[in-house]
Amino acid sequence: MKRLFMAITLFFGSCLFGFAQDAKTILDKCAASVSAKNGIQADFTMNSAQYGNSSGKISVKGRMFTATTPMATLWFDGKTLWTYMSNNDEVNVTTPSESQLQVMNPYNFINMYKKGFRYSMTQSGNAYQVHLTATDASKRVKEMFITVDKKTYHPTEVKLLQKQKWTTFTIKNVKAAKLSDAAFRFNSKDFPSAEVIDLR
């Protein structure tokens, strides 16, 4: 009886480990699909109980991104974030945290998932859905659901939980691009009348 119990425990343990490995493999392939050397561009929609709703375009190259919505334009060069608010012609300069970046850049999960999360995965139709649960209580992002296209391995939806509120990004029209590093930095020449406020 004891041997049977141990065998069952080992079986289910190995199954759960296998599912976690499969989920990690899917996320690794997903991260690789959006880590093109010269960058990618996409359209996105954000629905958030905490931050409101918006839509726009995003360009990503490694850790760098720029996002444009009707209200704001953001540039992040991997260290510094510039946020231009069109309603008051003002640019705020900050050094954001990873959790802050996550609600600005739906692709930022590729910089987060490898440490501090437990994985599980389901499949539905032409997509994988990977569920990530934080194993570190100090993480501001407690849960994430990443929906990944089975054919392209591009993420089509990123859903994350912060402060007990969900934010959902829907991503479409992904395409490769040739983007220079300069495209991810604010250029004052393009906004000559903007007031720059350094909050670092």
Model-found features: residue ranges?
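N-terminal leader/targeting segments and the immediate start of mature chains
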Residues: 5, 16-52, 63-64, 89, ...
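An acidic-aromatic
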Residues: 55-104, 162-168
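Soluble periplasmic/extracytoplasmic beta-strand elements of cell-envelope proteins
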Residues: 41-43, 82, 131, 147, ...
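Short, exposed beta-strand/loop patches in secreted or surface proteins that constitute
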Residues: 33, 56-59, 73-74, 118-123
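Non-transmembrane domains of secretory- and envelope-associated proteins
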Residues: 124-127, 135-143, 150-200
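Short, hydrophobic/aromatic-rich segments at coil-to-beta transitions
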Residues: 38-43, 61-67, 126-131, 152-157
